[in-house]
UniProtKB/Swiss-Prot annotation:
Family according to the record: Belongs to the amino acid/polyamine transporter 2 family. SdaC/TdcC subfamily.
Protein name as catalogued: Inner membrane transport protein YhjV
Organism per entry: Escherichia coli (strain K12)
Ranges facing Periplasmic side: 41-43, 115-133, 183-202, 268-293, 371
An example molecular function term from Gene Ontology annotations: transmembrane transporter activity
Main subcellular localisation: membrane
Compartments where found: Cell inner membrane
Length: 423
């Protein structure tokens, strides 16, 4: 019996369309509008700074997400993030850390909800489909969020069908533009190695930038939960989730680095500074060699698809976070098995639509959320997993060098808003 179990856990796993769907969702969560700003950032800081920061940050980000996923997948109970923490440490720890997880997720979905409404309304007016600015309409906001929430709540297979093609188009645009710039490579654009003090300062400042260019941690626990529901064997489900993460991350980094370096070799430091001052992306710089109308269309498509796929990806985590907190609180007064799951899901969906509509209607500034973003990600993706590893006996096998690495990385992410002061 034990031999059969070991054989099953060591056998080669087929890669299915379901796995491919999750790969696309993971990549879609990470790659997008921010990616096209990378060459400008590299041009500002210098290629040597970026190479050093990337050598440190990208392997470290891989370790962070891998450890994060493993800490969550070891739990015998796997309904939501709060439930997992409660299984490890009890309901009080579950609600406390669940709220922190919720804050990390809400940071992202609030930002994307603003983009969804205002960008879509702007495009509808720009392309002559409407005369009025629909972003001022309450009905438009409710309709937009109701449709997106209905799609995102329809299950991962529906998301695969809708979000998947968008991700393929996004990646296609990034790769095609990367190849289009190859004939314009000029290695004279590689700047000289900076002074040591400037170099180390800029590397320290660029590491968090690299982290956010490749992170898709928001979708990892929803993926972990989906695999656990799909597979009766916990170990098999974990293997599938880890493999999906591995394929997604390797593909993502390959695409990002190819695009970034292709443009970096094609633009000078002066052009990068000019682009930064004008707040334009690498695609705008590509207008020098690609017709302007193509740039306009692809930039629009990339922005729309980037916002939508990121919204769909982060919604899964947002819904799961709210559900976990509600069930944790209700479990203290009633038996949660008596709760109708469909009614709970519909109530959460309605709450999300109302919350996002109110948020967008008040046009609350997202600047404070940008400042809180890095510390929240540092706490949830690094500090909490480190705490769990050394607090929970079930996670003892994860202790060691990698655990201490994510602790240091988490501290750096938490301090990154302060590090901007030394720039």
């Amino acid at each position: 019996m034990q031999h059969n179990t070991l054989s099953k856990h060591n056998q080669k796993l087929p890669f299915t369309r379901y796995d491919f769907g999750w790969v696309l969702l993971c990549i879609g969560m990470a790659i997008g509008a921010g990616t096209v700003l990378m060459p400008v950032q590299i041009g500002l800081k210098g290629i040597w700074v970026f190479i050093t920061a990337a050598i440190i940050a990208y392997p470290a980000t891989w370790v962070v997400q891998d450890i994060y996923l493993k800490t969550l997948s070891e739990s015998d109970s796997c309904n939501d993030y709060t439930d997992i923490i409660s299984h490890y440490l009890g309901k009080n720890w579950g609600i406390f850390l669940g709220v922190i997880y919720f804050l990390m997720i809400i940071h992202g979905i609030f930002i994307y909800s603003l983009s969804v409404v205002f960008d879509s309304a702007s495009y509808l007016k720009t392309f002559g489909l409407t005369d009025a600015d629909l972003s001022q309409s309450l009905l438009y906001k409710v309709a937009i969020f109701a449709v997106l929430v209905a799609i995102a709540s329809g299950g991962e297979r529906l998301l695969f069908k809708i979000s998947g093609p968008m991700v393929v188009v996004k990646v296609g645009i990034i790769v095609v533009f990367g190849f289009a710039m190859i004939p314009h490579w000029n290695f004279a654009n590689i700047t000289a190695f900076p002074q040591a003090s400037v170099f180390f300062r800029d590397v320290l400042l660029t590491i968090p930038f690299c982290f956010f260019s490749a992170v898709f941690i928001q979708v990892l626990n929803p993926m972990n939960i989906a695999y656990r529901k799909r597979e009766a064997d916990k170990v098999l489900a974990t293997r599938l989730a880890l493999r999906t993460h591995r394929i997604s991350y390797i593909t993502l980094i390959a695409v990002i680095l190819f695009f970034a370096f292709s443009f970096t070799f094609s633009i000078s430091h002066e052009e990068a500074v000019s682009a930064f001052e004008q707040n334009i992306s690498a695609l705008a710089l590509a207008a020098q060699v690609i017709p302007g109308h193509i740039i306009h269309i692809t930039s629009t498509v990339l922005n729309i698809f980037a916002v939508l796929t990121a919204f769909f990806g982060i919604y899964l985590g947002f819904h799961e976070a709210i559900k976990g907190i509600i069930l944790n609180l209700l479990s203290r007064i009633i038996d949660t098995k008596k709760i109708n799951s469909r009614v709970l899901t519909l109530a959460i969906c309605a709450f999300i639509v109302i919350t996002l509509t109110i948020w967008v209607s008040f046009r609350v500034s997202v600047l404070v959320f940008f400042q809180l973003g890095s510390p929240l990600y540092g706490i949830v993706s690094c500090l909490i997993p480190f705490f769990l590893i050394y607090k929970v006996a079930q996670l003892e096998k994860l202790r060691g060098f990698k655990a201490w690495l994510i602790l240091l990385y988490g501290i750096l992410l938490c301090l990154s808003p302060l590090l901007k002061l030394i720039e």
